[in-house]
Regions:
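N-terminal first-folded block
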Residues: 31-89, 144
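HotDog/MaoC-like acyl-thioester-processing domains
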Residues: 2-25, 58, 83-92, 99-159
């Protein structure tokens, strides 16, 4: 989804030979993560998707401890999850994560949970960037350039 006309977005440039969208992170469903019906509990999906975002940030050189040390935090302001097909114990899954949009002080992320080629769930997240004081702040140019390889155009989104 394109930003509204007149809405500034962070200026980004793609880094040559950098990883590109989507970021992929494998996980295995563990027995204790199941609900009473033998399916992966809905709350675990949110945790898995968060793991996917954190792994992408780490790969981009934006680990949470480093961000905190530089005075930045990512704060989730909205999550929308669609549960399509259940996962069960022992399933080997892949979390795909992409950055859909970078704005001045927020970002929009798209994610998919896959079992092979089958999409089990999707999630869209809006995360604000704040200072350690909790107030919104702008993305630094370095943060934007590190996330650029994971940024997809509206037509490219797989997550």
């Amino acid at each position: 989804m394109a930003p509204a006309p007149g809405t500034p977005t962070a200026s980004v440039t793609r880094v040559p030979n950098a990883p590109t969208a989507p970021h992929r992170h494998p996980v295995k469903v563990r027995f204790y993560e199941l609900d009473p019906y033998g399916h992966l509990n809905h709350s675990v999906y949110v945790q898995l998707f968060e793991t996917g975002r954190i792994e992408l940030l780490d790969e981009a050189g934006l680990g949470l401890h480093d961000l905190e040390g530089d005075g930045y935090r990512f704060v989730v302001s909205r999550i929308a999850t669609r549960f399509l097909v259940p996962a069960i114990a022992g399933d080997v899954l892949v979390i795909e994560t992409e950055v859909l949009e970078l704005r001045r002080a927020s970002s929009r992320w798209g994610q998919r949970l896959l079992r092979g080629d089958e999409v089990l769930a999707t999630q869209e997240v809006v995360a604000a960037v704040t200072g350690t004081n909790g107030r919104p702040t702008r993305f630094s140019a370095d943060m934007a350039s590190r996330l650029a390889p994971y940024l997809v155009s509206d037509g490219d989104t797989g997550a």
